[in-house]
Amino acid sequence: MEAVVNSDVFLTSNTGLKSSYTNQTLSLVDEDHIHTSDKSLSCSVCNSLSQIVDDDFISAGARNQRTKPKRAGNDQAQQTTKKDCMVSIDEVASTHDWSTRLRNDGNAIAKYLTTNKYDTSNFTIQDMLNIMNKLNIVRTNRNELFQLLTHVKSTLNNASVSVKCTHPLVLIHSRASPRIGDQLKELDKIYSPSNHHILLSTTRFQSMHFTDMSSSQDLSFIYRKPETNYYIHPILMALFGIKLPALENAYVHGDTYSLIQQLYEFRRVKSYNYMLLVNRLTEDNPIVITGVSDLISTEIQRANMHTMIRKAIMNIRMGIFYCNDDDAVDPHLMKIIHTGCSQVMTDEEQILASILSIVGFRPTLVSVARPINGISYDMKLQAAPYIVVNPMKMITTSDSPISINSKDIYSMAFDGNSGRVVFAPPNIGYGRCSGVTHIDSLGTNVMGSAVHSPVIVNGAMMFYVERRQNKNMFGGECYTGFRSLIDDTPIDVSPEIMLNGIMYRLKSAVCYKLGDQFFDCGSSDIFLKGHYTILFTENGPWMYDPLSVFNPGARNARLMRALKNQYKKLSMDSDDGFYEWLNGDGSVFAASKQQMLMNHVANFDDDLLTMEEAMSMISRHCCILIYAQDYDQYISARHITELF
């Protein structure tokens, strides 16, 4: 019965067709400065471009390739910068036939809306399905529901599927200023066509043969070189150490630099950039980067960060976990300001939100109660990059813990104070928190009652768990020496979630490092010492703990874990006789393994965990949880009818 209620709530939720996107806080383009590859103390964009020039991604024999730019027309209509001007998405996203047919269906729905003078302010998914039935539009792929909705969502005052001309990609497409062309010409000199093409081809080829870190090119992983101090952040490992549906398409197959180039020179994008373009054109809020004062420079810096993350993905999947100071992407991610969130973010939420915002990735569509005029409430569809879980605002007991499972997954609410979607099961007392709106399935505002919030997920679903007890008082402990206190309230995390008839498995988790995770996991230490990641690979849970190479005690713990894993292989998973083996036949193996770890090299098998160990760590220390479909099942396409 609950599934029926959830379906009804979703179908009748307001889709919010009119776009609220506005990007009027920054100027269009810097008229006095063209970004080059020369290092500058006053321009962070030039500094990041200089790192791209100095960086040799991959050595390969390839001739320099030159793209032939299309001549810019003299049509004055293209030079408009009116804030209320609209441009058709169909003009921007001209790709192959498969996407053209999808957009034609979206245009037909939009035309039907305007011809019949529908009130778009109250438009629902049920209305769209009814119109599809009348127009004989049959769409069986479940992902096409997302795509059709994004096309129709931007319909405002006419039959064209539109976005505002304040969006930077539309300004690039319309050549709103001659300085845009000057800047992109300079970029063509900086981005070596050969090197960039090789980087794209390599990461895409890797993606074809990569499942998780157990299928890495080299199972002997290098954590550090003597001259390096930076490492791949555990959040990057959680997102790209396992192939996640939808995110892989946006980050590995899509490319922000080539997207900008194609929009300006050819006024259309190629098929591999199509989903990246749709994600970007339908984002709700722009991002602002500290030290960057105009829209075009922001897009250039976004392209630079996409390229830096792409290189990190390539290294992750080759088993290279260290990086030079210039290659570290974390400092750039920390400079992004998220205009849609009014609350101070912790370091880990900032990094997660920044990585996803670079490609506009918001895989979760939730029907939540939103306040109207401060006196009433309406159910609206809200796209979210991740769901926030705050244990410190939840009242729990041993009999009623915080549970993330198939039953409670429909308990979502909108936090008006921060602008985020939060996980709010009915038993945790969230109703007393300011800004959080609860509404029951009958439409009556009932604070603290069970929430019925239907959820549709495009491939992956992410949770961010707020465990820092004083995140609004202090920040930047990396630079000040201040250590956060961590709330280690246990969470009942289900390894599998059944959502709308589709199985989503726990693929990875980022956890707070409070002590050494082998000897001290049962200690009462509550001070943050860093992060580590647990990936659920085909060979079992695997831990990525980059900070272990900097601490002798942690290295000894890793050595003990590696020796135990080796002994279990030899003794058929038995622990009996381990120390006798270590003092006898295993002494040679122990000496060689110790030498490997001293050289900051480890094999994949060294850091395997049991399922019980992994789930115990995740329960008390997790800060990010990532659920996803199996990649092959996601690709094989499902029906829209299975969503309800």
Curated annotation (Swiss-Prot):
Propiece residues: 1-61
The keyword Mitochondrion is assigned to this record: no
PTM remark: The 73-kDa precursor is cleaved to a mature protein of 60 kDa during virion maturation. Proteolytic cleavage of major core proteins OPG129, OPG136, and OPG098, which occurs at a late stage of core formation, is required for production of infectious mature virions (MV).
Keywords for this protein: Virion
Gene Ontology CC annotation, any one: virion component
Region (Disordered): 61-80
Localization (cell): Virion
Record has Membrane as a keyword: no
Pfam families: Pox_P4B (PF03292)
InterPro entries found in the cross-reference section: P4B
Role summary: Major component of the virion core that undergoes proteolytic processing during the immature virion (IV) to mature virion (MV) transition. Essential for the formation of a structurally normal core.
Family membership: Belongs to the orthopoxvirus OPG129 family.
Name of the featured protein: Major core protein OPG129
Taxonomic source organism: Variola virus (isolate Human/India/Ind3/1967)
